[in-house]
């Protein structure tokens, strides 16, 4: 096979609706501002990926970064690891972090998708693993007692064996009321994860988490500011229940710092922020060496492939950011994600829908 080159990069900014707004203790995400990426190759295949900007304020900047990076990658070989190394070097003075790192991850994910298509194999098999069901939890919001309970019951009826609910209400009693109501509705053999979204200081996090661990929660996620690894370590040291973090690690190097000081007993990198497929591979090796169970954050389509190839795979987060513009090739059965038997990641754009949400 002759060398496959990158021949073009197209980006489209969209702002798509969510089935439920994502309410958190620190704010609400009402829509999903996404950058859709198409990476064309000399083999005739096109790799697809998308990025989540979190806020519409950052959407155009993220798209522009990708557009400006196009000239750096066109006519380069379709070799994701080498592309990542080149971009890391090009941006070392500006700082290979933040939106720059996120944009580079979008290129990486699209390149791996294209590589799978070139070899006519799903990404999971390209990574050397077999496709298998990946256990998933249904990810919810700061919904209040009634809606949180209703959504948990619905998830259980759909076959899920765990849910995550966001907490961080004004009073601890409110956090406990939500967890207790869910527990009463779904029973003891059902996982309940809780997420504070960085909303507490360390003393408050210790106090609330010590109360919550008596309720049998599976983990307590980001109880304090995500960059405060020492604070997380102090919280974890006072608890039996695992602290979960990682969605804001910008690259495996941040994961290494957190794990090295015992900031958490569970890890959940975000496929975008950790550095795409290339960053995830490195992160999964760290998790294996530290003996840390590793879950995913958002990006459920590609994360299913990645977790199936992760030695310490734990849970996939089911939260459908892009369902308005992506065909539902990733399915869920009996609480598990079922990887599609399609080349690459399996992302297929719903082109007729994309036009409705272009920014």
UniProtKB/Swiss-Prot annotation:
Essential cofactor(s): Mg(2+)
SMART domains recorded: MR_MLE
Pathway membership, UniProt: Aromatic compound metabolism; (R)-mandelate degradation; benzoate from (R)-mandelate: step 1/4
Listed result of changing residue 166 to A/M/Q: Loss of activity
Keyword check for Repeat: no
CDD domains, A to Z: mandelate_racemase
Chain positions recorded as substrate binding sites: 317
GO BP annotations, alphabetical order: amino acid catabolic process; carbohydrate catabolic process; mandelate catabolic process
Record-listed E.C. numbers: 5.1.2.2
Enzyme class at the top of the EC tree: isomerase
Keyword vocabulary terms for this entry: Isomerase, Magnesium, Mandelate pathway, Metal-binding
Assembly behavior: Homooctamer.
Protein family per UniProt: Belongs to the mandelate racemase/muconate lactonizing enzyme family.
Protein's name in the database: Mandelate racemase
Organism the protein comes from: Pseudomonas putida
Gene behind the chain: mdlA
């Amino acid at each position: 096979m002759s060398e496959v080159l990158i021949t073009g990069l197209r980006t489209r900014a969209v702002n798509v609706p969510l089935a439920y707004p994502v309410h958190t203790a620190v704010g609400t995400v009402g829509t999903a501002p996404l950058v859709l990426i198409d990476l064309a190759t000399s083999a005739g295949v096109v790799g697809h990926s998308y990025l989540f900007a979190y806020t519409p304020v950052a959407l155009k900047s993220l798209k522009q970064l990708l557009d400006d990076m196009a000239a750096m990658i066109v006519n380069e070989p379709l070799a994701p690891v080498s592309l990542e190394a080149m971009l890391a070097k090009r941006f070392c003075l500006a700082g290979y972090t933040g939106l720059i790192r996120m944009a580079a991850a979008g290129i990486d994910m699209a390149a791996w998708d294209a590589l799978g298509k070139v070899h006519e194999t799903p990404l999971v098999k390209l990574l050397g693993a077999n496709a298998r069901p990946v256990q998933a939890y249904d990810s919810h919001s700061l919904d209040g007692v009634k809606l949180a309970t209703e959504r948990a019951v619905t998830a259980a009826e759909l076959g899920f064996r765990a849910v995550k609910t966001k907490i961080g209400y004004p009073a601890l009693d409110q956090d406990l009321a939500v967890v207790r109501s869910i527990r009463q509705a779904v029973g003891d053999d059902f996982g309940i994860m809780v997420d504070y979204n960085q909303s507490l200081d360390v003393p408050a996090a210790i106090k609330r988490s010590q109360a919550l661990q008596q309720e049998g929660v599976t983990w307590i996620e980001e109880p304090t500011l995500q960059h405060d690894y020492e604070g997380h370590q102090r919280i974890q040291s006072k608890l039996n229940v695992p602290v979960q973090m990682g969605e804001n690690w910008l690259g495996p190097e941040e994961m290494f710092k957190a794990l090295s000081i015992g900031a958490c007993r569970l890890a959940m990198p975000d496929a975008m922020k950790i550095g795409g497929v290339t960053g995830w591979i490195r992160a999964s090796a760290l998790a294996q060496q530290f003996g840390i169970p590793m879950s995913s954050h958002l990006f459920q389509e590609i994360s299913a492939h990645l977790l199936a190839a992760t030695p310490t795979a734990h849970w996939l987060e089911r939260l459908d950011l892009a369902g308005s513009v992506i065909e539902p090739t990733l399915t869920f059965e009996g609480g598990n994600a079922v990887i599609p038997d399609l080349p690459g990641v399996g992302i297929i754009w719903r082109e007729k829908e994309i036009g409705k949400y272009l920014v």
